[in-house]
Every structure is written in structure tokens, then in C-alpha cells.
Amino acid sequence: MENDNYDVEEQGCSVFNGKHGYFARSCCVVFILIICVIFVFSVIFTFMQNPINLNSDNGFNQTSGNTSSLEATTLKPKFSSLMTTTRRFTFEQLFSGKQFLVDYYDYIWLPDGSFVQMNDDFTIRKQMKKIPLGSSVAEPFFNNGEYVKALSSNMKYAYGSKKVNELWRHSAEYLYHIVKINNKTVSTEQWHVGPEENSLIQAFYWNPNASSNDFVYVHNYNLYYQKDPEKPDGAIQLTVGGSTFNRFGLANWLYEEEILEASSAVWWSPSGRYVSYLRFDDREVNRIFLPKYTDDDSYVEYFELPYPKAGVQNNTLVTQYIWDSENHKIVETAPPNELSAANGDYYVLTNKWITMPRNGSDLGEERLVTVWANRDQNHVYFSLCNEQDCVMALSFQFSIDNRQLWVSPKDVRGVFPTETGFLTVLPHKHDDGNIYNHVAHVELDGTGTGKITKWIGENFDVILVLGYSSKIDALTFSAYGDGVGEFSTYIVREAMYSNKKTTLQKVTDQFEDCKTLGSQSADPTGQRIVVQCEKPFDNTRLYLVDVVDTTKKIMLEGGTKAVIPFDVPNMKFGKLKLPSGIDGHYMMLTPANLLDGAKIPLLLDIYGGPDSKQVFQKTPTAHAIQIVSQYDIAYARIDVRGTGGRGWDVKEAVYRKLGDAEVVDTLDMIRAFINTFGFIDEDRIAVMGWSYGGFLTSKIAIKDQGELVKCAISIAPVTDFKYYDSAYTERYLGQPAENLQGYINTNVIPHARNVTNVKYLLAHGERDDNVHYQNSARWSEALQQNGIHFTQLVYANEAHSLSHKLFHLYGEVQRFLMNDCFKSNLDLL
């Protein structure tokens, strides 16, 4: 009998012997041919597809994934006759969670000046190392990255936390526990924080004294003190009567958002003897009600939020206290007499404990420097307080040579002691006639009265004092400098006690291709700084730098170049002279491989808020890169009148008249772009803005009426500043009763009929605690009443950032731009 045996090839085709084998081989050949044909058609079909399908719901989440490279994608460009085929960064990749470069490194300073680099999204460090002060060599420090940021001052305990409830931009509620540290190892035993096992803790602060491990915390809006970390039942309640509308040690919405830019309102003294804290009384403040829609309730839920608006009589009432831990005594520190008569209409801008100079020994060893401001925020007062009394150190009005401006809380946030007084930032007239924020040395006499004895700065605004070391007499501060898109740390040696003219060293000059610094800080001793150099489309570089000798620098991270899986857009920085007399600064992205003679649309992304800055020489936002790369358009950001870094000559144009100079300069910048860059298609120009930028976008649409700007995208805009909060609005506009016309001019609602010849998109979250949906509700109603065609997106349960709906928002914005605004006869989506 003949066997019907057959062999099976490794390739997967069976080959039979005899007639059956011939038939089988024929079938196999036909099958392979069919597969090849299908493959060829699949490739052709793939390249004929539009870049993205915004109608599909792929469930992408914007997360901070790993470092694996994005896969390069070759797509047919939107305007194919203008561009060569190139590798593109797509909408799907934008929300893939994958990262193509490292833009930030986390670190901490220890109280002795040692540097410790933290775990981050890209590196897992089981063994933490530190670089001690005066050394360049890393040594073992701690074996647990989870707790290293939470060590007690004596490093014998640490806390762990788990977020339970998100509150506002900077605040949340947590479950805390304490662990013990033995030989730099975490114990298994834990102790809870709070009166009960699962108490929600709103803030936690270790005693900063190097030999201490006691702490204070905030629970249910009251402040507690605990001496022994292992005995939660021994905690002492320092305040009573705390509630949502009467907070101790925890900022209310207004202070968290507009004054402190943090939820923290507790300050330990360096010795650990004193604790100062603020009380925020909103019981008489008007409320807003934020809606929440759920499946659990057939009725709408409303959250009640105290929110003082511009011009209201009852603003937040703030009171300051000092607790003396030795005498267990709490005293209230009174505001300056000039403010006491204002019936609580004042602000506490910042607090900083300092060791008193030797000639002020009668004032005690430590005093709290408090910076107070009147309600209009154009007059500040520096007081020195302890548990016995307060003395006025300095009063400073923001009026120089009949010119007036506001104080920004961030300007005075960096207060540092010297041997004879303290340093802060205040405005000062420069040799060029402009008025800039400079470092001021306030020298104190034996009574605590101060006077400014020295100014340090050049022809640009100082942003923040980072540190000062009396030991080496060296000052460090951050500033934008006088270049376009720059941000650097500056070092001043022989800063206080030399008769020589002070000279400034720009730290970024020490590094190649480093014009903009990200995070920058000085160690607690003021003798070393950490800077993070941001270079466009490359990994950020992390440096540890010696203040005395900047050649002694260590690059800790960022030595490898980023691998970018798409063709990098071209990036331009520059300035253009405007009719207003100032130089408008800009950053512009254009597609890679842009052909000569090409004409492409322009999207101008604006913010423009007072004292803000948008132009930086660093990697743009991922959204900006994607929209340029995928759709072959130009994207720009600008800094014009009203923005920060260049003194009063630029800023003061918007004081008490928001929405005027910024709009004029923005339109003039667009004209200058058209005249300067031949690739811009003047018939396809769009402006987009969020928050204050949304306000300016609407103002531009009203003023321009489609002459230059064909499309406007306004996201979460202010439409009438009487709807916005008191602290921000009155800082720039003053009181409505004193500047009624200034407020009237910010109201876009009566001008809805002028939004003509422009395609308009409006988006807003209904649960926006910052810029209330009331703004867009009134604005859209006016547009409807005037018969204006526009597109509106309303996001239920979303706050100001729309963070949970960005996939949808960006998709709709891009659909609006490409299908409605930049519509072309070429290769439409």
C-alpha cells in the first residue's frame, strides 16, 4: 500500500506528493498572490486616508506615560501642493500618553544645603543619593523615594499621603500617615494623622528646626499641633470654629487663586518656636453656585462657593495670628494703622520669618515680615511682628514720577534676610527712564524702621529673589532679561557690603544653547543653585551650579539628545516694531520642509494678561506642535503691551483700561507678520485664546470685524469684568465706583452685533469656579439676540481647565479650523 504521507513546510504551506501535491502547490501560489494584492491595496488605501478621524472615539487619555518613542507617521498633508510629504505628529499621538523628550526633573534641597534628585516619570531610583554642600560627589542617602520628600527636619520620621478629594487648583484633602526612619530605612509600623483613623487632612507642616519632628496640620479647617509623631491622640487643637466659610491655616478660593497661589497659609519660624497662620472669613461674602450633574440624583447638585466680585462691599476678611509654642499663647497681629481704618479691605500678600539683625536685638531673635496691601493693591506695607508687638518697617506706594501701577503678589514673595535687614523686589526708576522691578535692600535700625539703601538690577524686571548668602555675600534672582524669549538666573557677588558697582552674571551664558530656564532655585544656604536648561525639541538639562564659581557646575541629567520621531517644525523668535512704539516679541512655528512660495494659514494663540509672558525659547506645547505638524499651518505666540518683564513702559498701558492696548498691538502684530513673512496667507488667519486670552479674542473679533482675523476661538472667556473676582480685577482696574468707564470698556456683551464677517467658536465649562459660565451664558445670549451665527461648546461638570474633556475640545477646535476656517479647495478633510 502507498502511503499518503506529506511534509509540512516551515513557511506554513503544505506540499503534497503526486497529483494532490500539484493541486496543493497551485492553491498555495494563488493564495500568496491574493495576499500580496490585498497588501498592496491596503498600503495604497492607508496613504489615501485623512490624517485623523475626529469622529472616532478611541478613548485616549492624556497621561504621563513612559519614554518610548512615538512611531513616525507619514501622512498626506492638508495643503499638498504647498508641502512635501513628511513625518508628522498626529492628533492620535498627541493623546497616546507617549513622550518624546524629558522636560523636567524633580529634586529637593535638604536644610543643610544638600541636593537630592527625586524619582520622576522616567527613572526609578531605589537608592536615593545626595550631593552635600561643598561637594560634587553623590553619596547614599535614603532607600525610599516615596518618603524622601516628606522627611521630618531631624530625618527620624516621614509622612505618606493619599489624595482623596481634589478641591481647587492648588488644594486637596488627603489621608496622612507617619512612618519611622531607622538607619535610612522605613519602618513597617504606621501612625495615622488626625483625630481619627481616617481623618481628612488639608495641610501638613513639619517643624523646620533641624532637631525637631513635631508638626502642625489642618483638619476640618482648624489648626492642630502634634508633638510626638507616634501619638496622634496627643494632638492639641489650636483653633476652634473652623468651617468651609471660616478657615484657619488654609487659603480660601480667592487667596489660593489670586494672592498666595497656594493653599498653604501657615508659616513656622526657623527656630520652631513660633507658628503664624491666617484666618479667612467668608461668612459675609456673596456666594456662587456651581452645578454638578450625576446619575445618582434626579436633581442638579449645587456647590456653594464664596466668591467676592469686583466692587462688592464684603470682601474676604483676613486675620493673622502667631502661636508661641513655649508659652502656648496665641496673639493676633494687627495690620498697619493705615489699613485698620479700611474695615478689613486689605490683603496679606506674603509672610516670611527672618532672624533679626544684631542691631535689632531689642526686637527679639525672630520676627515675621508681613507684606500687606490696600484693596486696590497699589500701596504695600512691610511690618515686623512677634508675639509681643508689630512695628512698621516700610511703606511703599506704587507711584513714581506721576506714573502709577499695581503690585503683583508674586513680586514680593521672595523675602530674604541680610545681616542688617532684608531683600525684596520693588519698582525703581532706571537710567533709561523706564521703571523696572529691582531688588531692594531694606536696612533696619534698632527700632525696626527700615529704609531702602541699595537697588540691584538692570534694564529688565526682576521676577523673584531666589536666595541670598550672608556668608559669601551673594544674591541670586530670576529675570527674563532683555532678550526675546529668555528666562535666566542672575548672580550678584559682593551684593550688599561692597562699595563697588554691582555686576550681574547671567547663568545661562555658562551653557550652550540655553536661553530659557525651567525650574530654578537656590539651596537654603544660598550657596548653590539648580537650573534646568530648556532647549527647543531636546531633553532638558539639569545642572547643579556653585554660586561663587559657576565653572564648578555638574550636569546631572539631559546629556543625551531627544529622539524626535517626526520632522521638527521650524521655530523662529524675534521682535517687530509696532506703531505703539514698543517691540512686539514673538515665537512662530512653521511646518518642516516648507516650500518656497508656499502660502499657509496662521493661528495666533494669545493670552496677553497683565504682567504675563508667552514667548519662551523652549519646546512649545504638544498641541501647538501637533497642529503645525499635521495640518501645515503657522502657529504664533506674542508679547505686546501689558505683558511682563520689560518695565512700566510696557505694562502701564493697560492699567485701569484692560482690553484696549493689547487688542491694538495684537492686530498690528498680525499686520507685521503679513508684511514680514511671505508664507502667511492673509485670507486665512485665526486667533485663539483661553481665559484672559478668550476675553481678548472676543475684543479682537469685535474691533476687527473680519478685516484681518477671519476666525476667532474663545475658550472660558471673561466677557464682563464685573463678573470676575475682586482681587484680580481691582488690581488692574481699580474700584468700579472710581473707574466706571474702565469697567464699561471691558464688557463685550453690548457689542455682540459687531462679531460679523468672522467665524466664531465659544467653549466653556459649566462648573468653572474661576471664570464662571455666567460669562459665556450672557455672551452667547447676546450673540443669539443679534442673529450672529457661531459655534458653542458647553462642557457639563468641567472646571476652568476643561482637563477631562481636552480630547473632545481639541478635536472640535481643529475641526473648526480645518473644515470651517481654513477651508481650501485642496485636499479637504
UniProtKB/Swiss-Prot annotation:
Intervals, Cytoplasmic compartment: 1-27
GO MF: aminopeptidase activity; dipeptidyl-peptidase activity; serine-type peptidase activity
Topology feature Extracellular, residues: 49-829
Transmembrane regions listed in the UniProt entry: 28-48
GO biological process: proteolysis
Glycosylation site residues: N61, N66, N183, N209, N314, N359, N754
SUPFAM superfamilies cross-referenced by the UniProt entry: alpha/beta-Hydrolases, DPP6 N-terminal domain-like
Intrachain S-S bonds: C514-C533, C711-C821
Annotated Gene Ontology cellular component terms: plasma membrane
Keywords, sorted A to Z: Aminopeptidase, Cell membrane, Disulfide bond, Glycoprotein, Hydrolase, Membrane, Protease, Serine protease, Signal-anchor, Transmembrane, Transmembrane helix
Listed InterPro entries: AB_hydrolase_fold (IPR029058), Peptidase_S9_cat (IPR001375), Peptidase_S9B_N (IPR002469), Serine_Prot_S9B/DPPIV (IPR050278)
Membrane topology: Single-pass type II membrane protein
Main location group: membrane
EC number(s) from the headed UniProt entry: 3.4.14.-
Active site per UniProt: S691 (charge relay system), D768 (charge relay system), H800 (charge relay system)
Origin: domain of life: Eukaryota
Annotated localization: Cell membrane
Entry's family note: Belongs to the peptidase S9B family. DPPIV subfamily.
Function: Removes N-terminal dipeptides sequentially from polypeptides. Essential for control of distal tip cell migration.
Name of the protein: Dipeptidyl peptidase family member 2
